[in-house]
Amino acid sequence: MITKAPDGKLLWLEKGNGKAGLKHIVDGHAADFEAKGIKDIPSFLNEVLKAKPIKTGVGKNGPFADYLVNGVKYRVAYGTNGFIVSFYPID
């Protein structure tokens, strides 16, 4: 998946591995998304990225953006090159 964030930044999600990308997200956070009623994580991520983030910053592991969707906060962590490292609910 390749998309542009509202600020124009190019972001993309690859299959990845246990540390980053879709495999990391599914392995580490699938249950969190299921608890929110979300089954198709890549499609949901694509929808989330169309919204304007409520917060952006740089944490100890790199850049992130927080989004509010249906009353739930989600974090997208990405590399400086736009590679999506992780995605998960933070509420």
Where are the regions a protein language model picked out?
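Ribonuclease/tRNase effector modules and their secretory precursors
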Residues: 1-91
